[in-house]
Amino acid sequence: FWRPSAIVCYSAGPFGGVRAAMHLRAVLGELGMPSIPSILPVPKVQDAFDDAGVPADAAWERRGKRFLDELEWYAQALAAARRGGTPY
């Protein structure tokens, strides 16, 4: 319990699977894995990466790093809080 989760979602359409991600956020919370506030949606995934998985736009590296930095921050914060005990 009390370990953070992060949601990456994708779709072939313009919304990047965010509707499914919102449902997953509720499920993860019930499992004791609160999700970080940010999600990383990948809209039009067929255009976002080439066949080798290389991002078509250099901005994906920046987005990914910021997303993982946030996950790491929450992991460290929740680890420190767990050392003090759980809320129940």
Per-segment meaning from a language model:
Residues 1-32:
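Helix-loop-strand module that forms the ligand-binding subsite of alpha/beta enzymes
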Residues 34-88:
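Glycine-rich phosphate/pyrophosphate-binding loop and the adjoining helix
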